[in-house]
Amino acid sequence: MKPLEGKVAVVAGSSRGAGRGIALALGDAGAIVYVTGRTARAGPKPADAAPGTVDDTAEEVTARGGKGIPVRVDYTVEAEVAALFERVKREQGKLDVLASAVWGGADAFASADAWMSAWGKPFWDQPSRQWQCMMTAGAFAYFIAGYYAARMMAAAGKGLIVGVTDGIVGEAKTPEYGGGQLVWDLAHASINRLMQDMAIEGKPHHIAVITLMPGFMQTERVLMHMKTEEMKKMFRFDLSESTLYIGRAVAGLAADPQVLEKTGKIHFVAELAREYGFTDADGRFIPKWECVEAR
C-alpha cells in the first residue's frame, strides 16, 4: 500500500512549475489529486507560451500510480474556487491536503525575455500591472483556496495546508528584500504572513499550515530563461533542483503523523529532504541554495 493511498489532495496551480511537481509526487505516493489551474488543453494559454496544462499533469499523476483529476480553475475568481471545493466534497467527502503554488507574476510581461530584462530595475520602471498579477494571483489565491479548504478540514478535525514561498534567508527564516523586484518580495512576504496567521487559527482544529522554501527550481519558465551558459552560470543553475524535490517534501509532510508540530513555520525543502530521507529526481540531495543564504 502506498503511503498516501486514499488521501485526497487539491494542488492549486499545478499545470506547471512547483505545483506540477507537487501533484506528481502526491501521485507517486498514491493520492487522489485534483490538478487545478488556469491552463487546460481546451482554453486560453499564457501570453509567454509556457508549456503545461492541468490535463497533462493529471494524466501523469495517474500514470505514476495516483488518480489525477484535472479541473480548470482561476484562483482569482472566488466562484470558481468555491465550486471546486464543493465538487471535492461531493465526490470525495473529505479533503486531506491543499498545496498552493499559484503564481501570476509572469502575466505582467509579454514574454520570458521581457520579464528577465525587467528584473533589477527600480519598481517605477517596471509594469504597474505586476501588483494585480502577483498580489491577486498570489496572496489572494492562497487565501481563497485556504478559506474553502479550511472549512472542510475544520469540520473533519484534521488537514494539511502547504504553500510555496520565496525571499527568506538563513536560519532565522525572516523575509528579506531580494533585490530587483519590489512587488515580488511584497507578494511573498504577504503569503508568508498569511500562512503563519492561518496556522494559528488552524491549530486548534488540528490543521497544519506550513510554508515551503525551495531552492532554484527548474520550472518550465526558468528553463525558457536559461538560454545561455552565461545566464546559467549567473544563476548557479548547477545548484538548481527539479520541481519533484518540493513535491516529495509535500508528500513527506502529508504522510507524517506528527506534522502538526511543524505548523506555522517556513521550512526549507532541503531540511525536509534530510529529515524524511528523499532526494531529487536524479538521486541527488540538493542542499539549501547558497544564493538564498547570500542575499
Predicted regions located by residue number:
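Canonical Rossmann dinucleotide-binding motif of NAD(H)/NADP(H)-dependent dehydrogenases/reductases
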Residues: 3-40
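A glycine-rich helix->loop->beta "capping" turn
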Residues: 5, 64-67, 87-107, 119, ...
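Conserved Rossmann-fold SDR core element
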Residues: 26, 94, 158-161, 192-219, ...
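The beta1-alpha1 cofactor-binding region of Rossmann-like NAD(H)/NADP(H)-dependent oxidoreductases
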Residues: 51-52, 72-84, 128
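Rossmann-fold cofactor-recognition segment
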Residues: 59-78
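Catalytic loop of short-chain dehydrogenase/reductase
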Residues: 104-108, 115-130, 134, 143, ...
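C-terminal helical subdomain
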Residues: 211, 230-295
